């Protein structure tokens, strides 16, 4: 008999002959087909093949992931190299800009000058309306000579002011309280004669070059009060043919004590045609003697806006002033 779980498709039915002719019973023999016998092992092998394919696919995915990871690592390395190169370029550029920057020497000077001017402005309580001091700064005004022999009382030289020329020397109230400056024309150009060797009054000169006095510091030490009481300078309209009157012996220290008005007077007397346009500029910036000696062509051109020719002339006069030389127009 054929089992219920099997079918005719999976078995081979064979009729078995009988030798009993009276019996109508027919016998069949059933055999399983060879294909059906090997069907279950084939199913197992197919499952194993599918497992291998899945494992191979997983391996391929892992390999691709590893390749992607390696690529990302290489990309990170390249990014690090690029960052190092960029930082190196930035450092090189900063070092280049620092080493090749424009050196403005006037910046520090400008800061000090502004600070100095501000400090002077705070200390200044009143505006100087005229060029006047307790001592006489005009060589055209004859005043009595000091009788004190102290070298610290040596008068300071200055320039001739045109507004003082029309003043009467005898009627000026300043004469009674101001000393007389040491006039360099009291000594000859080729032969130096001290005051104690001269007789009578001091001889004023109206012409001749500016002459330094090498013995100016020892004049008052050897000068007698008897000669000082008899000495009176003469009033002259012009000192040396030009408006400059500076002692070479004291010019190295005296210009630093000038006020703003003294600097303005220096500009007017030195070169009126070229330097008079700078008067208002110097007054607005309150440039005194110390600031004048510190001026350079860069400061004049870039900060004060002075023209090139005027700046060159003024620098030349400042250099001459530092050397203690007189200016001849």
Swiss-Prot record:
Pfam families linked to this entry:
SAM_1
Q: Which residues does this entry mark as bearing Phosphoserine?
A: 138, 238
- Extract the PROSITE patterns matched here: SAM_DOMAIN
Bias kind Basic and acidic residues: ranges: 159-168
Question: Where does the record place the region Disordered?
Answer: 125-189
Alphabetical UniProt keywords: Nucleus, Phosphoprotein, Repressor, Transcription, Transcription regulation
* Family statement drawn from the similarity comment of this UniProt entry: Belongs to the SCM family.
What's the protein called, per UniProt? Sex comb on midleg-like protein 1
Question: Gene for this protein?
Answer: SCML1
